């Protein structure tokens, strides 16, 4: 039994006259002049099969997506029927035998790229969705992407090491997913949010250059671009400075862009400190494919009579603006911008348009002096028709508002251009909503200065850095703490008392005591990188079998109920209130 | 700040006179003639540092495994002190500066390969254990092994596709590990025992050639070579016959052996049917590095007067023997063999030694006729001193007993030779201890003949096959069922009624309805392959961070108790009896 002698796209005019056997799916079928033309699709592409239903009766049974085997002779297509858009468009197979390997029920949706199908239906029939050309291309690209990453790191002398996924719960900013233990009832493993501590242990273990393409887990409330499980490239090196990390990650990202986009990126990538990124782009993950940079206007308005501006300055705030270019701005559109600014946290927004006659059209124009008006035009390099947006508030709010409006109004809607950059010098700590201090990156990140961290923690800068692509945070890394005394100090600044630190991290603090090398590393999301490189809007389109935003697989209906006996073996039970709620819902 | 200009083994006599900076660990330190000799170890190996403590006082502080940075000049070693067993044995670094990067506490055990350390202690300090040369070599080998596997499959046009690890519970012969869902309280994900159904879905999705190095999970009661989580190479192809699978896996295993052992294996590998393997070696995973094959003796004893033999034959059993070669056999040793046979399930064991004078020494010799005695010698090709072991019982018991004794007495105690083979033609079903019928491989395996499967299921042969290396089952595979009607028939033979099949597998049976290609595949354990190739006795020595046999990580003490609030969010609680037992134990 042979299913095939050739793949579809192996066939071309050099093979004319050869007998061939191909297997694949019926992608299209037309009848013309008593003869059937079947586009047979396999993993490589399409080839046209010509069959006479009078000779081969089974051809009349063929329907869309039937899986078939065809034996026949390769022939040149008759003049005028050559299809130049098809790789095999110069030939066709004249069938001698057609075998139906598997029939197909009528399809729930068409398998071309043009159909817009509800995502839940696509996921319910993911195995059909994956036959669509752009989804098949996404799977292929992802495989090539991880291949290129591995080759690059292999050449750089990295070891791929598998770290455990049934670990002890560690606090990394999101909820752990738990796995009850059967042999130690009442105890739980956690699924890793990242291999962070294990890769640091590998450094202590003398590995020096580690990487892993690792499955990680975060039980966050779903946002559009999050999944319960995701994949990250995780890497770490010993005797490394920040420069070593950045150069290595650049080599990996260059290889990725070359493999998937066939472009050679210029290195080193642009670098911005976190402060610069916030000041110029109002974001710690700026999209630098376009300008509209934020301009400081404080000095221009230091004597202003316009109360909103003077009030902001008096309150220790700042006045900043962006020029969003020449565009139509109806009153309704202007109101829309103000509403959006409020959504982003502003109390209001000043909009100004440079009219045809050079005067400023704005509800606040009358409050601004001539000097202020001309200063605005020159500072924001405004031309006729340009729209200027100005916010006055605390620095954080102004940055957030102008950064958000900048993206709304300027962001390209394709991913054709690739703009990578580094953001460095992140603050060591940040404030939680409840006012408590927490780590910005994770609690194993090294401060730039230990003294500064202790004396003025809220202004302390860490040795952490992010890689950003087209406004998407690809990943982050840092130089780690390798001195157990410093690690204890960081816990202290975070308000973790000694006893708690010992209970939760004692084993790790002990490991640091045995000649830990200085080390640092990085991790970035494969899903997000693949998404941008493939020009997709959703990570779900580059994940073979994703979950919905509520963590459900519509195909298998996971998660599901399980037998009570299984739970009993694990020493757990479902809480009474959950069962009651389920019964009430009539399940 | 530069930690190093060179790795230890970059340095040789061509570098004499160069100033170099190296970083690593103090592997050994001797003092001789007022000068300190420090073996500095990094990931590449060792280099000797010479320092004068009078000039560089810090040298006196150096202890084992301190992490240090040394700057100095490369010099040839004085005549008579060259060390030919060391890659850098012709040179040494004369230190100008030594910096302690991290001190180390005194070690809990010596880091050489000679020390025998209790495994629990090794795992408690795994980060130190990994610094030992053979453990470092195991990590490196494993990375090279998966690299070679990936390169091979990449060249063969396979896509690496990541399948989900939070799935719906499926029955594959072992217990699932469960993950409670927070967004759907009272529901659970399962961790996959293998990517089986998802890889079949990829075939339905048109991928045609898939592989993945996949983390899998089995909550089995621990045996010496099992872990809760393990890694397998998982592959699948469409339009494939058994031959296609075997050729592909052979290519992968050949690449693995070449990479790790630098040997070129002859292909195709030997193939035995399951029946042959059981008959000749008494095992479905025979170690064929040595003979001692099982010989059928039924016809020799068809008229025997020895009751044990005639009784076995009359009861439908069989008489078989092995020649375990010339060896000392005291009465106590012989009794030991009989005891071992009983452990293996025999009621007794006949032992015979060919004495110096050619007569047979055996408690049963007197019951055997001259013809039977000479027949035994000729059938078992016995020479002077040879020990013959004979079992008479049901076929299954005889195979088990002689197969077990054969391994005890013949198995080489190194893994120097690599003997791969295929076992094919496994039975479709087998009997569970309680007499019910279950699948031998998994319920998605195709029978050789559907008619036979329905008419005589207990004798039906499947299209399943195992790869065996030196008596270790590396993995198994099969041609799958691609016809939903056949899949339903298999469920029926397994006693799974239609409603249950629909409830548990309805989504998969539906997927099979959409033009499923014929397909088959394979999976083998990376841990076991790495173990044999590295000549280790335990898979734990090739897993970076394994668990103990009770599923515990002695380093982090996972699994651990978690906060009640975390459990509440997940809608679960620990059962009262578990809490009571814990309190009783005084925890």
Predicted regions and their residues:
Chain A
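Class II aminoacyl-tRNA synthetase catalytic cores and aaRS-like
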Residues: 1-587
């Amino acid at each position: 039994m042979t299913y095939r002698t050739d793949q579809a796209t192996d066939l071309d005019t050099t093979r004319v006259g050869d007998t061939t056997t191909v297997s694949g799916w019926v992608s299209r079928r037309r009848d013309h002049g008593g003869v059937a033309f079947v586009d047979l699709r396999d993993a490589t592409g399409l080839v046209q099969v010509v069959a006479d239903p009078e000779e081969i009766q089974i051809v009349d049974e063929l329907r869309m997506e039937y899986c078939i085997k065809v034996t026949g002779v390769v022939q040149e297509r008759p003049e005028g029927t050559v299809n130049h858009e098809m790789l095999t468009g110069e030939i066709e197979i004249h069938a001698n035998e057609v075998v139906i390997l598997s029939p197909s029920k009528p399809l729930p949706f068409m398998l071309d790229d043009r159909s817009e199908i509800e995502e839940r239906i696509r996921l319910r029939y993911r195995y059909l969705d994956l036959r669509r050309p752009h989804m098949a291309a996404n799977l292929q690209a992802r495989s090539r992407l991880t291949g290129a990453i591995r080759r690059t790191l292999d050449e750089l002398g990295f070891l791929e090491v598998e770290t455990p996924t049934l670990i002890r719960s560690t606090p990394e900013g999101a909820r752990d997913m738990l796995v009850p233990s059967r042999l130690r009832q009442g105890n739980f493993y956690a699924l890793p949010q990242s291999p962070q501590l294990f890769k640091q242990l590998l450094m202590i273990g003398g590995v020096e250059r580690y990487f892993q393409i690792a499955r990680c887990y975060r039980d966050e409330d779903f946002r559009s671009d999050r999944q319960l499980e995701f994949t990250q490239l995780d890497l770490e090196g010993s005797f490394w400075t920040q420069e070593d990390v950045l150069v290595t990650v650049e080599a990996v990202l260059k290889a990725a862009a070359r493999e998937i986009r066939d472009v050679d990126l210029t290195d080193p990538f642009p670098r911005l400190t976190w402060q610069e990124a916030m000041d110029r782009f109002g974001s710690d993950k700026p999209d630098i494919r376009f300008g509209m940079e934020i301009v400081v206007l404080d000095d221009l308005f230091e004597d202003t009579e316009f109360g909103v501006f003077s009030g902001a300055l008096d309150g220790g705030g700042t006045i900043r603006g962006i020029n969003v270019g020449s565009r139509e701005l109806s009153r309704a559109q202007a109101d829309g911008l103000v509403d959006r600014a409020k959504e982003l946290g502003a109390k209001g927004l000043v909009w100004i348009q440079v009219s045809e006659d050079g005067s400023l059209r704005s509800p606040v124009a009358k409050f601004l002096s001539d000097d202020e008006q001309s200063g605005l035009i020159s500072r924001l390099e405004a031309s006729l028709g340009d729209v200027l947006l100005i916010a006055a508030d605390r620095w954080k709010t102004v940055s957030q508002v102008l950064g958000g409006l900048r993206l709304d109004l300027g962001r390209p809607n394709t991913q054709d251009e690739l703009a990578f950059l580094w953001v460095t010098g992140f603050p060591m700590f940040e404030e939680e909503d409840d006012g408590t201090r927490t780590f910005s990156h994770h609690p194993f990140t090294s401060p730039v200065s230990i003294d500064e961290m202790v004396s003025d923690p809220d202004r302390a800068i860490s040795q952490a850095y992010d890689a950003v692509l087209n406004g998407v945070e690809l990943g982050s890394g840092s130089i780690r703490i390798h001195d157990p005394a410093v690690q204890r100090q960081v816990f202290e600044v975070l308000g973790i008392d000694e006893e708690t630190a010992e209970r939760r991290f004692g084993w790790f603090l002990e490991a640091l005591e045995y000649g830990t090398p200085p080390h640092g590393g990085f991790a970035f999301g494969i899903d997000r990188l693949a998404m941008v490189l493939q020009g997709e809007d959703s990570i779900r389109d580059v994940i073979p079998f994703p979950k919905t935003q509520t963590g459900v697989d519509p195909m298998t209906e996971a998660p599901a109920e399980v037998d009570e006996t299984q739970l009993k073996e694990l020493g757990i039970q479902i809480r009474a209130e959950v069962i009651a709620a389920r019964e009430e819902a009539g399940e």
